[in-house]
Each structure stands twice: as structure tokens, then as C-alpha cells.
A protein has these predicted regions:
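P-loop NTP-binding/switch modules centered on Walker-like glycine-rich loops
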Residues: 61, 206, 210-272
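Conserved ABC ATPase "signature" region
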Residues: 92, 149-167, 220
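A short, proline-enriched helix->beta-strand linker immediately N-terminal to the Walker B motif
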Residues: 191-195
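ABC ATPase NBD coupling module
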Residues: 32-37, 92-116, 142, 148, ...
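Conserved ABC ATPase signature
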Residues: 172-176, 180
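Hydrophobic anchor residue at the start of the ABC signature
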Residues: 136, 186, 210, 214
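Helix-to-loop junction immediately C-terminal to a conserved catalytic motif
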Residues: 74
Length: 272
């Protein structure tokens, strides 16, 4: 594993995620007629840190690069350059800082245990032909040696954790409301006990009353499990409610970052 450094004492490392000069460019042009190719910088040198157990909001209008940043951090798409350092706990105590971008395929598979994502549209991210119990247990099947009975028990625990009856595990995504499906998405993301979650517009597709319920659930889970969140959104009211710190993104760059209270009361950048 491409370790950056390690700490022998629990809690001595208080930065859960450090992103430095993250760049993602896409080739454009060419096409069937062989026109001139160019590059578009969707993410142009983004840097930030998230303290352990805290929530950083990443805000900006559609197309500014928020979701591309998230997917680059997890390497769901490959970043062009930069550094993403994740702090993960070590067996027996202490912690280790891992360069996600430098990890090979096997190492990245191991890192998936420690970082997960909850998508905006839970229906699109759930296989309609797969029961929710199977969908939640899929990661357990791939990444653990649990027996079928142990996986089933764990799925029940996860459903209970997000406020759902374990008996619904045999039902299918279309049988649930949008808010329930998002709870299922959260349960699946928590299956491997990750310490870091990216929440990519997790409530934007929900009614306002359901938004509040899901946001309260996310806060409860953070307090209970010590989770660290990168919360991507365009709704400033939601960000103000849940985020400790906020970074404002514009045209692929972060133009301002501060505590959420300071940013909302005394913004410094004109775009903010």
C-alpha cells in the first residue's frame, strides 16, 4: 500500500482526507472527421482538507466540477494529476495515511472498505432486479469472508441503523419511496464500516420534509459512527444546516473556503 506516513497513537492524526492540486482534464474534439483535439479542465487544481468527524460542503452551480471532483477522489474516474491522501485506522490502533491516486488496483480495492459514496438518485444506483438485501450485501460478499447467515444478519443491522425494518430486505427498489431508497443507499455505503463518505447531492431529489429526515439521519450516523463527510450540493440552505466547513467551486476551481458560519455571514469572493 502506498503509505504516506503512519501514527502510532489513536487520534493523533485529525485530518481524514487531504486533496492537493487535483486535476481532471477531458479530451474533446476529433470525432469521425478527425478534427483538432483539445482539452477541457473539469477540475483545475483543487485542494482542501477535511478534519476527522467533520463535514465539508462543496458547493457550486451545475457543471462547475463538483461531481467530477468526487469521482476523481474515489477513482471512479482516473484523475489527471494531484494527490488524494486518506487516513485510515490500523488494526491494533493508530492510523495510516494512504495516497489513493498512487494505489494500484489491488490496493484500491482494499481502500474501498474505507471510502464510499452515496449518489443523488438512489433508484438509478440500485439494480431494479436485485432485492435491497442483496444490493446491500453485495459489498460484503466481495470484500469479506462472512458466511451467508452472517451477511444476512449484517444487512439486517444496516437496515435498522438507517431506520428501516430488517424484514424489507427481500423487497425490490420500486417498492420503496424516494426517501426510503436513499436510506437503503446509505445502508449500502456503510456495509464495510468506512470512515469517509462522499454524499453527492444526497437529498436534492427528495421533497423538503423528506430531506430533513435524511439530513437528520446523516447527522445521527456521523455522531454515532464518527464518520467524515464530503457533502456535495447546490442548495445553500442544506449546506448551512449540515456542514461544518464549506468550499465554493467555480469553473473547476475552489474560489473560497471557510467555516460555514463565516462563509455565510461574511463571504469574501464575489462569486460566493
Amino acid at each position: 500500500m502506498p503509505s504516506v506516513s503512519s501514527s502510532a497513537a489513536n487520534g493523533s492524526q485529525d485530518v481524514a482526507l487531504s486533496v492537493r492540486d487535483l486535476v481532471k482534464t477531458f479530451l474533446v474534439g476529433g470525432g469521425v472527421f478527425g478534427g483538432e483535439k483539445g482539452e477541457v479542465s473539469a477540475v483545475a487544481g483543487v485542494s482542501f482538507e477535511i478534519g476527522a468527524g467533520r463535514t465539508l460542503g462543496l458547493v457550486g452551480e451545475s457543471g462547475c466540477g463538483k461531481s467530477t471532483t468526487a469521482r476523481s477522489i474515489l477513482r471512479l474516474i482516473e484523475p489527471t494529476s494531484g494527490e488524494v491522501v486518506l487516513t485510515r485506522p490500523l488494526d491494533g490502533g493508530g492510523s495510516e495515511r494512504i495516497d489513493v491516486i498512487a494505489a494500484d488496483r489491488r490496493q484500491l480495492r482494499e481502500l474501498r472498505r474505507h471510502m464510499q459514496i452515496v449518489f443523488q438518485d438512489p433508484f438509478a444506483s440500485l439494480n431494479p432486479r436485485m432485492s435491497v438485501g442483496t444490493a446491500i450485501g453485495e459489498l460484503l460478499h466481495v470484500h469479506t469472508n462472512l458466511t451467508r447467515k452472517e451477511r444476512s444478519d449484517r444487512v439486517g443491522e444496516l437496515l435498522s441503523l438507517v431506520g428501516m425494518n430488517p424484514n424489507v430486505a427481500d423487497r425490490y427498489p420500486h417498492e420503496f419511496s424516494g426517501g426510503q431508497r436513499q436510506r437503503i443507499g446509505v445502508a449500502r455505503a456503510l456495509a464495510l464500516n468506512p470512515g469517509f463518505l462522499i454524499l453527492d447531492e444526497p437529498v436534492s431529489a427528495l421533497d423538503v420534509s423528506i430531506q430533513a429526515q435524511v439530513l437528520n439521519l446523516l447527522e445521527e450516523l456521523q455522531d454515532r459512527l464518527g464518520l467524515t463527510y464530503l457533502f456535495i450540493a447546490h442548495d445553500l440552505a442544506v449546506v448551512r444546516h449540515i456542514c461544518d466547513d464549506t468550499a465554493v467551486m467555480y469553473l473547476g476551481k475552489i474560489v473560497e473556503q471557510a467555516s460555514t458560519d463565516r462563509l455565510f455571514t461574511a463571504p469574501m469572493h464575489p462569486y460566493t
